Amino acid sequence: MPDLQIGRVIKPHGVKGEVVVDPSTDHVPERFAIGEALRAVQTGKERQLTVTGMRRHQNRLLVTFEEIRDRDEAESLRGARFMAAPLHDDSDDGYYDHELIGLRVLNVGSVDADTANRRAYEGEQPEPVDIGEVTGVSHGPAGATLEVAVDADADLPTAGSTILIPFKLAIVPIVDLDNEALVVTPPEGLLELA
């Protein structure tokens, strides 16, 4: 399994080499623990950095590294992505962002999960309509949101543009990694919002 992005440097903070990090992991204490060696990737270059301090600041982290001693060195990290191997938790039934990106999006209409399953897998009419592909996942206080590039030939007013779909069980009842697709049961009007 490929390494995952666990955070990204936004900007320097202060004059002593601290950086603002936008975390993209549910395991912040483990990933950014003091003494943890992080792999920073930036414009094709990689370097190892050792965490010497981490504190929360609003929805982000302020992190210091042994190798970064001042603001100029911290500025050189702007935009760097921290990559790490996945942590495996057998009790976790969630999905990593990279597993969702690239999945085809099948619309079965505004129906319940059982009807969605019958339409997607048992041939019940009307069959699902392939509307596009997941191109990104964003995370906010209300949960994850899928960024979907709607196919230019889709029969939707948003054809050729990007729409946002809340990644909630009521709207995305089926994620089928084996068939590289997910099924959506959007409320009326959701797919028309660009």
Swiss-Prot record:
**Entry GO terms, CC:** cytoplasm; ribosome
Location in or out of the cell:
Cytoplasm
- One Pfam family it belongs to: PRC_RimM
Alphabetical list of InterPro entries matching this protein? PRC_barrel-like_sf, PRC_RimM, RimM, RimM_N, RimM_N_sf, Transl_B-barrel_sf
Q: From the UniProt record, report the name of the gene that encodes this protein.
A: rimM
> Which coarse location class applies to the principal site listed for this UniProt protein?
cytoplasm
This chain belongs to which protein, by name? Ribosome maturation factor RimM
Organism of derivation: Corynebacterium urealyticum (strain ATCC 43042 / DSM 7109)
MF terms per GO, please?
A: ribosome binding
Where in this chain does the record put each PRC barrel domain? 92-190
Keyword set, alphabetical order: Chaperone, Cytoplasm, Ribosome biogenesis, rRNA processing
